[in-house]
Every structure is written in C-alpha cells, then in structure tokens.
C-alpha cells in the first residue's frame, strides 16, 4: 500500500491506431481493464499514445518503445530541470530525445508511423489520452498531461496529481516526530514551523 504516493503511467495496446486507441481508452464495451478497454479512473494514473520508434542504445537496433517509456523519460527529464509540480509535457520539458517517429504496430507486426494533427491531439486529450506527437521543427514531444481523474478539477492534470502524491509522501516523513506528542500549543507551534 503506497497511500497514493505513486503515479502510474499506462500504455494503450501496441496494435491500436489512434481511433481504436480513443475507443479503447473510453472503454465503452469493457467491464475490466484489458484489451477491450480501460475502465479505471484513478487520479494518480495517465495514459499516453502512440508508441515511439527509437534505437536501442545497447545494440543500435531499431525498436518500438512503449508510450510509457517515452512518458517516463519526460517525467525524469522534467524533474531534473524543474520540479514535480511542473508539467512533464510541451516544448520545454516534454521533448523526447532518441525517438525518430511515433506510431503503432500493424497486424503484420510492422511499425506504422502516424502524424497527429491539432484536431487529432485535441480529440485524444479530451478523451484523457495524452498525445505524443512529432512536430517538424521540434521532433517528438509529449503534448498532454491529463490524468484519469473522473471529473474536471485540478487533479485531472499530471503535474497537480504528482505534486499531491509528493506532498503526501513528504508530510508522512515530516509529521512522524509529532506522533504521540501532546496536542498542546507547543506541539502545534513546532509542527507549524516545521511544515
């Protein structure tokens, strides 16, 4: 039990084109998470699409990397140059190195590159499916930060959900010395100055 201090990055199945990925994300025919759809609405989760065509640094071979790999890279990069409460997306913190294109696997197991238009990206984003797009001048960029939070609020953004998870984890550590202390003015003053 992580007490909602973790963040889960979810992949759409590799074989789905963008229309199928949106249908899968909306999970209209699914009764549980799986190939038929995604039914979860966890605040501390986000789905990214499509996958990326990249190079394995160990072998030099071209491989298809899952969208979660690309998203995780941008999370790490964003955290390195800013903080958890900055969006790991966009042209500043969402650029992906070492990815030539984005797409999906066909039924013949071939990588099919896709080009997401503004309309495609908007439709995906409204369906809580974070687009990974290739821009001519900028390259591959994570261009969304929606969580699977069930309603419109600040928590339907990755940066806010990650900040909340981070604060939960930090508060449990910071508050530990005050356990079993008397609930008096001195303890409250010490706790307030600590927080």
Q: Predicted regions span which residues?
A:
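Structured, hydrophobic secondary-structure cores that serve as assembly/anchoring elements
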Residues: 1-194
